[in-house]
Amino acid sequence: MPTTIPEALRLLRTFWTGPDWPFAPPAAAATLERLRQHVGRPLPPPLEAYVQLAAPTQPLVLEQVGNPLTLYALDELSLVQPGYSHDARTGQPLPGWPATWLLLGDIGGDPVVLDVAAPGEAVSQYYHGEGSWASGTPLANSVGQLLLCAAAMHHALTGIVPGQPALATAAGGQLLLAPAAAAWLQPRLRAWAGPYAEDWAGPLANALPPPPLRKPRLP
């Protein structure tokens, strides 16, 4: 299960089909220095690697089932995010938002967060409109894993059967990937997402390999 940015980028290059390669910041030094000053301590090495090697220079929309994941552009990465950490009108800090949370992006407005003071913790999605940020859903054990899994879902939904619907609803109401997309995604999502695979699969009934059949016990 890859957890580093270089390993995630190596695997991304094996399937990324976009017209441009968006994961190559041309000049990250200013962003790194700005973040270091905000944090007041050395940045976690995985975050430094993301900023230097992979943060997109423009907001990057990665399609998922439901709302897409929007990764914020390099110059948008900050501990100060209007509407989340601070009031967008007054600029005053909002209560309840941890000062060490860095927004990597959002899913339909739900923030995807890395805690710069606890880099060993999971990258998690939290939910706006619930009155607090007390609980969220872990998505990945690192920024590299988040990037890889989100890009894999995006590719399965947009890059396997271009020009054709990637999703269908079965007779029983199950949401299914197109067969070719499911065949591509199943082994990769299980291997790359590890314990977070079910969260990435979401409502897709065929995003993961079926469980192995149990052999009947002999009498």
Task: Name what the model sees in each region.
Residues 70-73, 115, 141-142:
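Helix N-cap / beta->alpha transition motif
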Residues 105-108, 118, 130:
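Short, flexible loop/turn elements at secondary-structure junctions
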Residues 105, 115, 124-126:
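Residues in well-ordered beta-strands of folded domains
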Residues 112-115, 134-136:
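Short helix/loop capping segments that flank catalytic or ligand/cofactor-binding pockets
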Residues 124-159:
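Compact, glycine/acidic-enriched structural inserts
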Residues 1-111, 164-166, 171, 176-219:
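A surface-exposed partner-binding patch
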